Structure formats: structure tokens, C-alpha cells
């Protein structure tokens, strides 16, 4: 697993994001519930976070993820990339995704 302490800072457009193996998730009316089996913590994602999580069913780069999200959300590209990097960095810190 990548260094999760600095995961947000280490992300580049070519960083590949993969869902961690030690977790399970389910859709709850458009939101996402996730449990990390490693630490026993449950997490909840709002509809935007749930959309990102579902896109990560297959490993994607930050660039690919942002391209998919840009088709749905009317937001400035630089803002989108920044927000995605922060979000993915937090998921990595919680052990929910791996970054390569």
C-alpha cells in the first residue's frame, strides 16, 4: 500500500486508485456504507462520494476519474481535480483505497 500519511500530496494525474481488499460496501439509497475490516470502522459517503466509490469498482487513474466526473458535474476542472485528490487522499488515509 502507498504511504497513506501523505497520500493526498503524492497523488498525480497518473496515480492509479484501487479499492482496498479489506473492505465491503453497499449502496443505501444513493449513499454508500463502507466497513474497513482491518480496523472495524464504518464509513458513510454522500451521493457524490458514492458516485466516486462506484467508479472505482475498476482501478482508475486520477485523470480517468476526473474525466468521468466532469461529464456529470458542472465544475471548473482545476477545482474538480483538487477536490478529487483531497477525497482520494482521505480514503487512502482511512485504508479504503490503495494508490500506485
Please report, for each region that a protein language model flagged, where it lies by residue.
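Detector for Asparagine
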Residues: 6, 36-39
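Long, charge-rich, low-complexity alpha-helical segments
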Residues: 2, 28, 41-100
Amino acid at each position: 500500500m502507498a504511504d497513506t500519511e501523505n497520500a493526498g500530496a503524492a497523488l498525480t494525474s497518473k496515480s492509479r486508485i484501487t479499492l482496498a481488499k479489506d473492505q465491503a460496501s453497499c449502496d443505501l439509497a444513493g449513499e454508500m456504507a463502507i466497513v474497513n475490516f482491518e480496523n472495524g470502522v464504518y464509513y458513510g459517503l454522500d451521493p457524490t462520494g458514492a458516485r466516486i466509490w462506484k467508479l472505482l469498482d475498476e482501478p482508475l487513474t486520477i485523470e480517468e476519474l476526473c474525466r468521468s466526473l466532469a461529464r456529470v458535474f458542472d465544475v471548473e476542472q482545476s477545482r474538480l481535480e483538487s477536490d478529487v485528490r483531497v477525497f482520494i487522499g482521505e480514503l487512502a488515509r482511512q485504508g479504503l483505497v490503495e494508490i500506485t
